[in-house]
Amino acid sequence: LPSPAKVYIQTNFPGEKTSFVAKDDDLAFAEYTVIMMNGTKLEFSHSGALSKISSSDGIPAELIPESIREYVQRHYPGAGFVEFDIDRRTYEVKLTNRMELKFNNNFHLIAVDD
C-alpha cells in the first residue's frame, strides 16, 4: 500500500487488523482494496488517496466531511453512513435509510436517489 493509505488506516482504524489487501493493476493506474477484520472495505487510488469506504455496520461519521455530516444530520436525523465514495468532482454517500446523496466539490447537494 502507498504510504498515505497506510497512514489513513493507522489513524482511523487504530488497532484494527486487515484481513485482505489487493492491488488491481488492470487499470491505467493501480488501485488498492483493503478489507478490515471488522468488515469495513476501503479503496485507495494509486497515490494512496481514499476513494471509497463501505461497511454494512456503518462508517464512523467522523470519516465523512463535516459539511456532508451536517447536511445529513439536518435532513435525515438518525441516519448513518454505510458507504462514502469520492471521485474527482463528487462525493456520494449511502445512508442506513437507503438514501443516496451526491454532492459536488463544494459540498452542495446535486442529486438524491432513494
How would you name each of these model-derived features?
Residues 1-114:
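Interaction-mediating elements
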